[in-house]
Amino acid sequence: MTIFDSDEEELVTTLSDFEPPVQIDTSFNKFIVVDNIPVAPEAKHEKLKSILVKIYQNRPGAEVVGIHLALDAQRNTKGFAFIEYSKKESAIDAATSLNNYPLDKSHTLKVNLLDDFSKFANFEETYKPPTREDFKPKPNYNQWLSDPKALKGYDQFVTRYGDYTDICWNEMHVGKPMVEKSSVSLTSSYVQWSNTGSYLVTFHPDGIALYGGKDWIQVNLFEHRGVQLVDFSPEDKYLITFAPIASDNPNSPKSIVVWDVRSGKKLRSFLAPPKEQFTWPAFQWSAKDKYIARIEQLEKGINIYETPSMNLLDDKIFEVKGIKDFSWSPTDLSLAYFVPANDPLPAKICLVEMPSKKLLAEKSIWGATDARFHWQNEGAYLCVKTDKVATGKTKKEKIPTTSFELFRTHEPNVPIESFEIQYAIKAFSWEPRGKRICIIHGEFKMNMFVSFFEVQKTSVKLISKLENRKLNTIFWSPRGTLVLLANLGDTGELEFYNTQDCESYGTQEHLQCTGVDWNPSGRYVTTFVSHWKVQTDTGFNIWSFNGDLVYSVLKDRFFQFNWRPRPKFMLTNKEINQIKQNIKKYQEKFDKQDEDDNKAIQHIEQTRLDNLMKEFLSFLQKGEQEYQALEPTRKQLGSYEDIDPNDIYESIETIEELIDIKTIVLKKIN
């Protein structure tokens, strides 16, 4: 039979063996349907499309391939449109993240997947109740606060040395860290606590991981390749990650990503500014995790984004021409911004309420070129350090001066006061929950001044001044009143100072100290030497608040020490004062607990030593029995000379030692 004898059906079957049939994708999983768009004539179609592209392409990795407007006979839009993405994941993300988008006051855009219409059209008429899944409670990430050790006032801290990461309890009476969990290669670089202490962040080549709970389980994983920096929102609801990317795609940026902590969902991504303009944190968080903001790169104003939608506040930039810096209040929804002097206009500092953008206060300053914002942690005061040049008789006699503007933000009409410091400022810090300010200033680092000011009813008063100090950094106790003044990176001088009584508790030294960290209670403070900066004598010292060394730990290749933060202090100043007044009632209880704890630890240690002694004596007895059992063998061999039991004797030597001499005068007898 020749090939021409084969019929057509046989020929088709033969070809299919060599080439698979074409697979046609009949799904619409890359399409979404946007409803409630404005009804527009044909002349406005392109403008409407550009608006829709701007909205629905502003998601991480989203790329709009096409937009199809539904039209009527007069070529007017029908109020809905079809949008096609390059991949189905973008369509799913848009349906969940961009639903109910407020286009304007009259139009709220609704989004559905096009594939969902077939599901809704074939919906079963017979109701089937959903299956109930068993409730699985999530771990309590603040469980450690109810731990008996935490209730006794002990705090946790994390250390990194070599390849080890240790989480320890600070039980001071033990005299050493009590390790709760030790891990090897837990992170590739460093670790970081969240602001409330609920999570511990570890860094990896492909992203970061969050750990927490009683058993330190992995809470969530955030994929962001090359991530180097993390910034949590004040209440730990969101976090921002940064990874340096040389050529980031503006349509799908990957440098800066905002995440929802609990769900692990990526909310939005941003381009990073040029390297020479980059600062961290890249965004500033408002109080209550409500907004994030950063200055627009052309200095036209501030981009303020609402959470969790990550849309611009009022869909536009907050315009402030020439803005150089801004800062949120730590407790209120208000921000302060600075615009430098621009001849002939003076510089100005403004305090603005959000989201109304109402101006609360404004101060004009002639000749100011730079400003730094310093908020008191309760938001009651804002101190702005301004740098300006005061011109002398000639241009060569320009003398740099530093002035401060104090805003009383919680008082009616926000009163503003000014005060000046004679020399250049090295460090500035507010007392937590207090009214005192500490400033290090001077011309020479070997001869610095430390000035303490107090905000009073109508003025800012100098209350104390230290002279001829070799100090460069200020570390306030979290409870205020006490402050540690340090000279980091050099001699490691430490001065413990009480601002209430204006007295120094004393000075100490931790050579080549690279960092200081107070524990949340304010009872202890840690100084450490990190291997990242110094290669010898690395480790940490823990001091009491008045400068007594509690214990010292040296570790080879020691990198990091961080106390675990506690959640925000919930007690008011009135409640704190009541506790202070009744402290004697609690003192006996606490002393009894400490005594019982010490006895328990001593008992455990003594039991351990007794067990070791019993084990040693048992080993000796076993060896003696084996030795006696081999006596016939030794006699037969004649190689060893046994000890005659009669040669063993016990000698007791009595030693008299003079312990004490007392002179007693007896009554004279006549």
Curated annotation (Swiss-Prot):
GO biological process, one term: formation of cytoplasmic translation initiation complex
GO terms of molecular function: RNA binding; translation initiation factor activity; translation initiation factor binding
Highest rank taxon of the organism: Eukaryota
Gene Ontology CC terms, in alphabetical order: eukaryotic 43S preinitiation complex; eukaryotic 48S preinitiation complex; eukaryotic translation initiation factor 3 complex
Cited SUPFAM superfamilies: RNA-binding domain, RBD, Tricorn protease domain 2
Ranges of the WD repeats in the UniProt entry: 183-221, 222-269, 466-507, 509-553
Coiled coil regions in record: 568-600
Subcellular location as annotated: Cytoplasm
InterPro entries to which the protein is assigned, alphabetical: EIF3B, eIF3B_RRM, Nucleotide-bd_a/b_plait_sf, RBD_domain_sf, RRM_dom, TIF_beta_prop-like, WD40/YVTN_repeat-like_dom_sf
Alphabetized UniProt keyword annotations: Coiled coil, Cytoplasm, Initiation factor, Protein biosynthesis, Repeat, RNA-binding, WD repeat
Residue span(s) of domain RRM: 30-116
Primary localization class, coarse: cytoplasm
CDD domains the UniProt entry points to: RRM_eIF3B
Subunit: Component of the eukaryotic translation initiation factor 3 (eIF-3) complex.
Family designation: Belongs to the eIF-3 subunit B family.
Family matches, as HAMAP family: eIF3b (MF_03001)
PANTHER family associated with the record: EUKARYOTIC TRANSLATION INITIATION FACTOR 3 EIF3 -RELATED, EUKARYOTIC TRANSLATION INITIATION FACTOR 3 SUBUNIT B
Function: RNA-binding component of the eukaryotic translation initiation factor 3 (eIF-3) complex, which is involved in protein synthesis of a specialized repertoire of mRNAs and, together with other initiation factors, stimulates binding of mRNA and methionyl-tRNAi to the 40S ribosome. The eIF-3 complex specifically targets and initiates translation of a subset of mRNAs involved in cell proliferation.
Designated name of the protein: Eukaryotic translation initiation factor 3 subunit B
Native source organism of the sequence: Dictyostelium discoideum (Social amoeba)
Name of the gene encoding the protein in the UniProt record: eif3B
